[in-house]
Amino acid sequence: MNKSTNDKINKAFFNMRIYLVIFLSIIIPVSGQELSNQKKKEIFEVDRLSSKGPNAAPDRRKDEGKGPYKRLVIRGGTVIDGTGGPPRGPIDIVIENNKIVKVQDVGYPGIPIDESKRPKKGDYEINATGMYILPGFVDLHIHTGNQFKAPDAEYTYKLWMAHGITTVRGVALGPTEWALNEKERSAKNEIVAPRIYVYDRPGNGADWKGGPINDPETAKKWVRYAKKKGVDGLKLTSPRPKIMKALLDEANANKMGSVAHLEQKGVAEMNLIDAARLGLKNQTHFYGLFEALYKNNDVQPWPYDMNYNN
């Protein structure tokens, strides 16, 4: 077979593949996607409610918790410190102005404690004899909810607190201004809630006038805007590499945190190794990690019927 004939055959097969792909793209999506009007209304209602933030937590009642105290002492507990070491005790813990200042061994199990060697008396004391003491848990990926699911932030906060979570990183906690206000109220002990760190998505903010984040300079302007508002860090997806670099450069220069859900829409240009090299601090979910492990950092072999929006 001469070269000319071979080229014609290859071209014919190439065109056939194109027609086949177009044909499949026409007929495949039609199957099984007819929705009733009622179902469409339900979907639109869920979308409408999901776009609205939750109700703010009510002010703390007088019977909800005690303190803070100038000097709080927790006495005689067995501590699990979270480092991987074994439990130990009895231990006295001294907290002054909401800060742990001393963790002191005061004896041995089953042997009377020498009171003269214990920390001095506190304004308020808790007898933790026979109890275990752990540091508060930190949840690095939380959302409060919305008007469709978990519409009351009070419920969410108290659920976290009841499970020992005393610090949270919202990614995002809720709408920007709402989240910053809840962060401030928590810091002032005006509400029953964990300590809150606010991470936000580029372009968010009711008074942001810079438009969509479509170029590196706008990306940097938004980071400076967010920093000024009191945002603690960035919640990213997988923007184009130049924009990702600009966001991370400016965030790191302003001592802000960063976390990314490297969604599959952009993972061909930005896997986890790429993002880490640009200065990303944390990853959430696992998108971008597996692609970084592929030979030559390839992307997954998507099924022909995959639809990212499904």
Regions found by a protein language model. Name each.
Residues 70, 75, 89-91, 164, ...:
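Envelope-exposed proteins and targeting segments
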Residues 17-24:
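Sec-dependent signal peptide hydrophobic core
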Residues 1-16:
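N-terminal secretory signal peptides that target proteins for export/translocation
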Residues 24-31:
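Hydrophobic h-region of N-terminal signal peptides that target proteins for export
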Residues 144-146:
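Short active-site segment of divalent metal-dependent hydrolases/proteases
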